[in-house]
A protein has these predicted regions:
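PRPP-associated nucleotide enzymes
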Residues: 1-186
C-alpha cells in the first residue's frame, strides 16, 4: 500500500478544462472575453456538491464568465431511483452551457440535467468529465444528450458493441460516438 501511495499523482483538472475550452473556442468561433475564453458560455456544476470545486476551478483558470449550478435529490419508488433536479435559471438566453464534473458512470444525472436545460432556452450543451466509463453507453448513451462530450484518457474504456457476423458469430466492434472527444493527459 505504501508503494502505491508513493506513486500516486494527483492531477488538477484545470489543464483538462483549459483544453476543453480551447476546443470549444475553435468549434464555437465566438467572441472571446478576458483570457480568450468564450463569452457566450456558462460553466455549470451538475449538483450542489460540485459547485465549490467548480468555483475553485474558475479561480485557477481565471474564468470571469457566468457560472451556474443545479441541485438534485433522489426519490426511491418501487426500487427505482427517480432524479429530481432544480436549476436556478429558467432562461439562459441562448447561451451555451458546459457542465463540468469528475466522473460519469451511467450518466443519469447528466441525462436528466440535459433534458431540463433544453427547456431553459440554452444554446448548445457540452459535458466535460475527467473520468468516463462504458456503463453509460448502452441503449441510451449520455452522448445522445449533448452536442459534445469531453473526457480524459484516465478511465476511458474502449467503446465496443456486440454484433452478429454470419461467418464469425458474435463480434465486439470498436466504436466511439462521433461527439465524444478524448483529451489525452496520461
Amino acid at each position: 500500500v505504501e508503494a502505491l501511495m508513493d506513486n500516486v499523482e494527483i492531477i488538477d483538472n484545470s489543464k483538462f478544462i483549459k483544453n476543453v475550452l480551447y476546443s470549444l473556442e475553435v468549434e464555437m468561433s465566438v467572441n472571446k472575453g478576458n483570457d480568450d475564453y468564450p463569452i457566450n458560455l456558462v460553466l455549470m456544476s451538475s449538483d450542489a456538491g460540485g459547485f465549490k470545486p467548480l468555483m475553485k476551478l474558475c479561480d485557477k483558470i481565471r474564468w470571469i464568465g457566468e457560472t451556474a449550478s443545479a441541485s438534485k435529490s433522489r426519490e426511491y419508488k418501487n426500487g427505482e431511483t427517480t432524479l429530481t433536479q432544480l436549476i436556478a435559471h429558467n432562461d439562459f438566453r441562448g447561451k451555451d452551457i458546459l457542465i463540468v464534473d469528475d466522473i460519469c458512470i451511467y450518466g443519469g444525472t447528466f441525462k436528466g440535467l440535459a433534458k431540463m436545460l433544453r427547456d431553459c432556452n440554452c444554446g448548445k450543451l457540452y459535458l466535460a468529465v475527467s473520468h468516463m466509463t462504458v456503463q453509460n453507453l448502452g441503449e441510451d448513451p449520455v452522448t445522445n444528450y449533448f452536442d459534445k462530450v469531453y473526457c480524459t484518457n484516465s478511465k476511458y474504456d474502449n467503446y465496443t458493441y456486440k454484433t452478429m457476423d454470419r461467418n464469425h458469430g458474435l463480434l465486439d466492434i470498436l466504436s466511439q460516438p462521433k461527439n465524444l472527444e478524448i483529451i489525452k493527459l496520461f
